[in-house]
Amino acid sequence: VLILVATVIHGNERSGREAFQRFFKILTDEKLPIRAHIVGIQGNIEAWRRNVRYVDEDLNRLWTREHIRRIRMGAFHPRTREEKILVKLVQAIRHYRSKLRPRQLIWLDLHCTSSPRGTFVVSTRHHANLFLASQLRIPLVLGLDHILHGTAIRFFSEIRNAVSLAIEGGQIGDPRAVHVHHAVIWTALKAARLIPREYFDIVAPHEKFLTEISEGLPHKLLVRYAHFIDSTYQFKMLPGFRNFDYVRKGMLLATQWDGPVYAPISGHLLMPLYQPQGGEGFYIAREIKH
């Protein structure tokens, strides 16, 4: 099994990088016998140095089939910083897959949101993805892969024998997001049966932590609406909204160049945008009861 832990795909979402470094130190210091090859991926280092989401364009919207096909053919000519990074990442991943020939690949993409209470896992509906996601003890969000194009988890979910999840650790800059990402890595390893049973006691506190921070939140949601924007929209979210807040149809949520923005449907608010960069102002999801 090859596990790729992706960090700073968005440069200002820094907790995943720190969490992986913490995880890797424990792994090497304790010499734990993990049944997998684990590789940390540092995505947009240029954006990380500047502490911004991206420099030229969103790296997590570039993982399209056409881009990957052209990179593999040597026919992709990058124009932006993020396109150059994409080429390096695709080539590095191809190298590890070719060298190790794993029976399974697991892509864990560590992110944060610009709004409070943003701890959840994003998955596609593929069975293997759903199984692993359901073991992480945090809310599960479905449907984003049909709304957002060019994301890494969508690309990896279409690879044979691959599992891909995006983990939102919490609000950008919140120290607890580091703990969430660290806990998720350990919990995912146990769920994938890559840790010997005699080491389960190492994972137990992480599972307890994830269960506690998810208390009172919906277990499973389906995204039903995305409010797309660009830099010309002058979009501004009203202050005070948090992830999972319940909003009713017609409720005032934001303003933009053409006037007020009202909730088009009722549901749980996800990822309300409180940073200058981003292509989506907010999402609305509905809880899946069954």
Task: Give the ranges of each region predicted by the language model.
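Structured catalytic-domain cores with a bias toward divalent-metal coordination
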Residues: 1-290
